[in-house]
Design a protein with these regions (language model features):
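N-terminal intrinsically disordered, cationic/polar leader segments
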Residues: 2-104, 109-139
Length: 139
């Protein structure tokens, strides 16, 4: 997985991102490319940008998806693995700091090629071919 850097830093291996709005609140556009793992990249971005709380939404494509459904006490009771590429119909979530580390809570609805759809907590997913996220910072 490529490392994430804040929009003020540049590195060849950084996930593409751009600060769209600055002031009381900040909004970043983040573009993940093929193979980037969503949850890990968002956590790394939050850590590198020193974010304490944020909300995000996104669209694009994923592969090697693992969704968690029917959570009780914070633990998914049903895990749905999807290995084929899927379209992201909706991706929403938030980031908060717990014990000094960013915790990403993403929820997604994805569509398979046959038209069937699945939704739940996004436990894992890799961009394919890309995933675009708008992240709004509220700290």
């Amino acid at each position: 997985m490529r490392s994430l850097k804040s929009s003020l830093e540049s590195a060849e291996d950084a996930v593409k991102n751009k600060l769209l709005q600055h002031g009381t609140g900040r909004t970043y556009a983040i573009v993940m490319e093929t193979g980037d793992e969503v949850v890990g990249c968002l956590a790394a971005f939050a850590r590198d940008a020193h974010l304490s709380k944020a909300e995000f939404k996104g669209l694009g494509g994923l592969r090697e998806v693992l969704l968690g459904c029917f959570e009780i006490d914070g633990h998914p009771r049903v895990r749905v693995p999807l290995t084929e590429p899927v379209g992201v119909m909706s991706l929403v979530g938030n980031i908060a700091v717990s014990d000094g580390e960013p915790k990403v809570d993403p929820h997604a609805v994805v569509r398979q090629a046959d038209g069937s759809a699945w939704g739940g907590r996004l436990l894992e997913g890799h961009a394919c071919p890309s995933l675009e996220i708008l992240l709004s910072v509220s700290d």
